[in-house]
Regions:
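Acidic (Asp/Glu-rich) sequence patches and key acidic residues
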Residues: 1-114, 120
Length: 120
């Protein structure tokens, strides 16, 4: 996915160029802990500082009780719709960030029942 016009999320290529691993990876589908694949080329990444500053972590935690910012958390389509609706209510940069991620999430849900957030 091309991320050149993205304000909040980075492609894996952009994340790698930053020389940082302090990112939350949004991984398409169900993550396979046995394969231990991190920083997938189809993933989008958001820096931990930005995730916190936007309140995206709190938004997700409010909808997905098992959300773990340091581990793996699966998000299904119903949860994603609730995240989008709540972000729209809250507005501002949080809504912008969720809106930026939406095309990627919608593409994911055409082929997968979940996407996985891999925490820092």
């Amino acid at each position: 996915m091309e991320t050149g016009n993205m304000k909040y999320f980075l492609s894996e290529k952009e994340r790698k160029a930053s020389h940082s691993t302090c990112y939350h990876e949004f991984f398409k589908g169900r993550w396979d802990e046995n394969a231990m694949v991190y920083w997938d080329s189809e993933s989008l990444n958001i820096h931990d500082d930005l995730m916190i500053a936007l309140g995206l972590d709190r938004l997700i935690q409010g909808i997905v009780e098992e959300y773990n910012p340091y581990g793996e958390t699966e998000i299904n389509a119903c949860q994603w719709k609730r995240i989008c609706a709540e972000a729209e209510k809250l507005g501002g940069s949080l809504f912008e960030a969720v809106s930026e991620l939406s095309p990627w999430a919608e593409e994911n849900f055409r082929q997968n029942s979940v996407f996985t957030i891999l925490g820092i």
